[in-house]
């Protein structure tokens, strides 16, 4: 009994005698969890932490724009960086080489799993924490596309073969559109659908999903080549990055498969120009492509503050994004024109500028945002 009383009496003294270093070590997990919760609450897609001199700058990528959030003192930053790398199963002592890892959502109470990428810079280590989107996949009709675009997509997805290409810069919503297409196909049923992704961001029941791993030589091209032996009816390629993948996609679309892929280009015309450069058979390219979507995302005016800064939009005046889209359906007569005169004859339906004007007329965004996105 005397021993128990002595132990209890000494416990508060041990707590109050905690050193500053011990306190920082204990606070790092809480700071990391708070950052993740704040980012998820605001709808941020990424958390950026950058060592600059004796401090680390913290910023969120919110609706495609970098928003400064806070500054961490050097001693705090070191422990926060170490905690993030520990959770992602990376080498905590390594700050001179890039590293990639994942954090299980359960370890930090996050909504979804988290991707971590570190990189050495001249001012110190940089960490980007990617927060994967909500596990609830939106339907095509929930993407804020014009009705005509939804109709075109649904019509294509009911086909048995052909190539659908999505284009636009990084962060323009292409992956979100692909997942909505996958949801539509899963609900349609009756098909064997296989994906090749980098990375897999959402699990779609009923879809066979594959994640590339370049460290183990599993590239888009290699995965797509082998997956064609898995008897797919629909093949989804996260990104066409090289000539081999491009030729696989075109060949598959011409041999009874539906293929959905993304390709970096600035316009519907640019998609054909790039694909024709990447593929050996120009006739096959024009025959395979059925539908092209070119899109951007524009920030929506915050409906909670109507332009007056508020906590919902982190004082930006914007909350959420709306797609600007133009599309091109390839019909028989147009195929002949493209073969005879080249991609210059392509005239997409709608235009990004026209879509932006319609949003301005509805007061859903503003001129400065249109200029930022379209130039």
What are these regions (language model features)?
Residues 2-375:
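Short, flexible helix-loop junctions that flank or precede catalytic/ligand sites
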């Amino acid at each position: 009994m005397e021993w128990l009383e002595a132990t209890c009496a000494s416990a508060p003294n041990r707590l109050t005698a905690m050193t500053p270093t011990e306190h920082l070590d204990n606070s790092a997990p809480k700071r990391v969890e708070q950052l993740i919760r704040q980012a998820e609450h605001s709808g941020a897609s990424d958390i950026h932490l950058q060592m600059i001199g004796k401090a680390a700058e913290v910023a969120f990528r919110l609706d495609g724009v970098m928003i400064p959030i806070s500054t961490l003192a050097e001693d705090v930053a070191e422990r926060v960086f170490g905690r993030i790398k520990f959770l992602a199963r990376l080498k905590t002592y390594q700050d001179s080489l890039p590293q990639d890892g994942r954090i299980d959502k359960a370890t930090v109470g996050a909504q979804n799993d988290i991707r971590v990428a570190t990189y050495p810079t001249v001012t110190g280590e940089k960490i980007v924490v990617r927060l994967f989107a909500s596990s609830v996949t939106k339907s095509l009709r929930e993407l804020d596309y014009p009705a005509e675009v939804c109709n075109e997509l649904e019509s294509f997805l009911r086909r048995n073969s052909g190539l659908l290409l999505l284009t636009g810069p990084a962060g323009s919503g292409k992956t979100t559109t692909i997942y909505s297409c996958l949801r539509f196909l899963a609900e349609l049923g009756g098909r064997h659908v296989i994906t090749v992704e980098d990375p897999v961001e959402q699990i779609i029941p009923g879809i066979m999903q594959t994640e590339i791993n370049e460290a183990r030589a599993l590239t888009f091209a290699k995965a797509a080549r082998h997956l064609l032996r898995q008897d797919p009816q629909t093949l989804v390629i996260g990104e066409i990055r090289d000539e081999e993948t491009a030729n696989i996609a075109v060949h598959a679309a011409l041999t009874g498969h539906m293929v959905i892929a993304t390709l970096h280009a600035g316009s519907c015309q640019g998609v054909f120009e790039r694909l024709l450069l990447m593929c050996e058979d120009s006739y096959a390219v024009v025959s395979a492509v059925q539908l092209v979507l070119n899109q951007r995302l524009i920030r929506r005016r915050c409906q909670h503050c109507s332009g007056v800064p508020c906590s919902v939009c982190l004082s930006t005046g914007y909350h959420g994004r709306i797609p600007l889209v133009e599309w091109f359906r390839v019909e028989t007569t147009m195929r002949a024109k493209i073969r005879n005169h080249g991609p210059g004859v392509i005239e997409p339906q709608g235009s990004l500028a026209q879509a932006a004007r319609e949003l301005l007329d509805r007061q859903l965004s503003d001129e400065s945002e249109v200029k930022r996105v379209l130039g």
